[in-house]
């Protein structure tokens, strides 16, 4: 599901809100989440999961085109850990 599909679905389910209002709310929520992660804080949404930063240590990688070694710096990357309720709901899905 894309962001625009999510906005459309929420606007349909919440008929008292316009698509523009839903879009604004989604954008603001995502902006607040990004800002929180930028400061190094953790985000926890009970029943859904938590977002945090994980550190990736410096390492030696390879350029896939040339095969030469490339030194990669350490960096922080966003990490999502699903909550128990979300894990259980997804586990119940039979493809």
Swiss-Prot record:
Keyword Cell inner membrane: no
InterPro entries: Hist_DNA-bd, Histone-like_DNA-bd_CS, IHF-like_DNA-bd_dom_sf, IHF_beta
Molecular function as annotated in GO: DNA binding; structural constituent of chromatin
Record region (Disordered): 56-76
Keywords attached to this entry: DNA recombination, DNA-binding, Transcription, Transcription regulation, Translation regulation
Listed PROSITE patterns: HISTONE_LIKE
Gene Ontology biological-process annotations: DNA recombination; regulation of DNA-templated transcription; regulation of translation
Alphabetical list of Pfam families matching this protein: Bac_DNA_binding
GO terms for cellular component: chromosome; cytosol
Function comment: This protein is one of the two subunits of integration host factor, a specific DNA-binding protein that functions in genetic recombination as well as in transcriptional and translational control.
Stated family: Belongs to the bacterial histone-like protein family.
Record note on quaternary structure: Heterodimer of an alpha and a beta chain.
NCBIfam families per the UniProt record, alphabetical: hip, PRK00199.1
Record protein name field: Integration host factor subunit beta
């Amino acid at each position: 599901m894309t962001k625009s599909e999510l906005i459309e679905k929420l606007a349909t389910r919440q008929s008292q809100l316009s698509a523009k209002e839903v879009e604004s709310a989604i954008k603001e929520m995502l902006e607040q989440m990004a800002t929180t992660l930028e400061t190094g804080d953790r985000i926890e949404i009970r029943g859904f999961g938590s977002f945090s930063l994980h550190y990736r240590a410096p390492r030696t990688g390879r350029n896939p085109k040339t095969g030469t070694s490339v030194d990669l710096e350490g960096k922080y990357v966003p990490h999502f850990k699903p909550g128990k309720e979300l894990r259980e709901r997804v586990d119940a899905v039979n493809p």
